[in-house]
Amino acid sequence: PLAAAEMPVPVYLDEAGNVLPDDASLDAVKTSVYTIRLKPGIKYQPHPAFAKDAQGNFLYHQLGEDARKYSSPLQFEQQGTRELTAHDYVYEIKRLASSRIVSPILGHMGDYVEGLGDLSKTLQEHDKALKEKIQKETGSAFPPATADLPWLDLREFDLPGAKALDDHTLEVR
């Protein structure tokens, strides 16, 4: 709530997507839509993931196996930051659906964020197919551990219930 410019007011929709009055009966409400305006200028805590060189290139995004020698973000020489945006919130909501992240609230949130349960199934199928592909390519007797899978860019997956309308406006339904 502290990142919101003001407390969002829900808009209630019926089965056909029509806006309902605020005093509509609960039986008539099919969807609640929250439009959340974020305060501009909120920045991430300094972190090496945001560190860039003079040309604007990320310093530590291609470390590969060298990343294993660091046990703390504080060990990196350079730190950086950037503004928090509505796109970041959408990404984090999508992360709830990933089986790569332990999310104790997924079952609950799946009932409230449109498409979150479906996204969870899609991501599980994606990872299962990826594990099978890697196992086949490597000839291993066992599939790779989830922690050994390559990075999964959740921006490539749609979630109807969370949209960034612009950098500072988030819609959740």
Which stretches of residues belong to each language-model region?
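The feature preferentially marks the first beta-strand/turn patch immediately downstream
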Residues: 1-173
